[in-house]
């Protein structure tokens, strides 16, 4: 029993790290894989949110030089202050809506069917937005994002509260809509992930910390470690990929996964 849970945690940690920062929905993939390996239930739902902490720390480590430099320039008007202020402004919309709708989303929207629909809808949006705005960008550096543009990227992030939309996809699309290059949008998306995912992870830990067993803590540790290692590799490779390539392959992949999920649901393989 113990080894079985730890193996499942190992697998789910890798899935989280692979998918969290790609615009393909980590939630969708965790639901699919969780259904196949029979990792479901209350602990599984909490586990999938908390192991995001490993992915967050991977981003912190990847941007450590920029983060440390920004923390040395926190006087009003300095670039570090401006960066974190804009990140906070972008964080607020999803934070407020998330607090107000958390219970409803958790009880009614965390299902394979809703995730499949979100994967497909998000894929279509990615294709359309890239076709229209992909080469019309005016901002190629996240440091040049204005406060108003940061706010609208934050508004776009609200879409990611719907399971399957993908936080990464929502914020990258939002960035492109307000004039960022896909790479600049991705970098801002990763920075924005730090407060957003820390808040979500902290909220779940506070709710469940007193009711977890030692074995569940061990499973969380395994998932956390694998999520960190895998996400660190993915962030580096994804940003390098965006220097020369576009998002459409990820959109087509989302379409494929969404249709596959609908088929598996119809066959009652995934419930």
Swiss-Prot record:
GO CC list: plasma membrane
Gene Ontology molecular function: any one: undecaprenyl-diphosphatase activity
Subcellular location field: Cell membrane
Key words, A-Z: Antibiotic resistance, Cell membrane, Cell shape, Cell wall biogenesis/degradation, Hydrolase, Membrane, Peptidoglycan synthesis, Transmembrane, Transmembrane helix
Superkingdom to which the source organism belongs: Bacteria
Main enzyme class: hydrolase
EC number: 3.6.1.27
Principal subcellular localization: membrane
InterPro entries: UppP
TM ranges: 5-25, 43-63, 80-100, 109-129, 145-165, 186-206, 215-235, 246-266
GO annotation terms (biological process): cell wall organization; peptidoglycan biosynthetic process; regulation of cell shape; response to antibiotic
Its membrane topology: Multi-pass membrane protein
Reaction catalysed by this enzyme: di-trans,octa-cis-undecaprenyl diphosphate + H2O = di-trans,octa-cis-undecaprenyl phosphate + phosphate + H(+)
Task of the protein: Catalyzes the dephosphorylation of undecaprenyl diphosphate (UPP). Confers resistance to bacitracin.
Family of this protein: Belongs to the UppP family.
Note: Bacitracin is thought to be involved in the inhibition of peptidoglycan synthesis by sequestering undecaprenyl diphosphate, thereby reducing the pool of lipid carrier available.
Record's protein name: Undecaprenyl-diphosphatase
Organism: Caldanaerobacter subterraneus subsp. tengcongensis (strain DSM 15242 / JCM 11007 / NBRC 100824 / MB4) (Thermoanaerobacter tengcongensis)
Lineage start: Bacteria, Bacillati, Bacillota, Clostridia, Thermoanaerobacterales
């Amino acid at each position: 029993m113990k080894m079985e849970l730890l193996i499942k945690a190992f697998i789910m940690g890798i899935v989280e790290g692979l998918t969290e920062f790609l615009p393909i929905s980590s939630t969708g993939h965790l639901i699919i894989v969780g259904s196949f390996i029979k990792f479901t239930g209350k602990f599984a739902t909490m586990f999938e949110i908390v192991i995001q902490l490993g992915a967050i720390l991977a981003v912190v480590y990847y941007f450590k030089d920029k983060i440390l430099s920004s923390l040395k320039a926190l006087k009003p008007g300095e670039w570090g202050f401006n960066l974190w202020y804009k990140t906070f402004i972008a964080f607020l919309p999803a934070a407020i809506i998330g607090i107000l709708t958390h219970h409803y989303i958790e009880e009614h929207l965390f299902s394979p069917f809703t995730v499949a629909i979100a994967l497909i809808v998000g894929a279509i949006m990615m294709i359309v937005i890239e076709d229209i705005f992909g080469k019309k960008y005016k901002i190629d550096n996240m440091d040049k994002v204005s406060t108003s543009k940061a706010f609208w990227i934050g508004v776009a992030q609200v879409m990611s509260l719907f399971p399957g939309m993908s936080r990464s996809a929502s914020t990258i699309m939002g960035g492109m809509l307000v004039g960022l290059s896909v790479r600049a949008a991705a970098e801002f998306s990763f920075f924005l992930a730090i407060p957003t995912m820390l808040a979500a992870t902290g909220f779940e830990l506070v709710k469940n910390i007193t009711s977890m067993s030692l074995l569940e803590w061990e499973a969380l540790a395994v998932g956390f470690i694998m999520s960190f290692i895998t996400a660190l590799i993915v962030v580096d490779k994804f940003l390098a990929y965006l220097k020369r390539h576009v998002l459409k392959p990820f959109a087509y992949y989302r379409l494929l996964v969404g249709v596959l999920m609908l088929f598996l649901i119809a066959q009652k393989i995934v419930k």
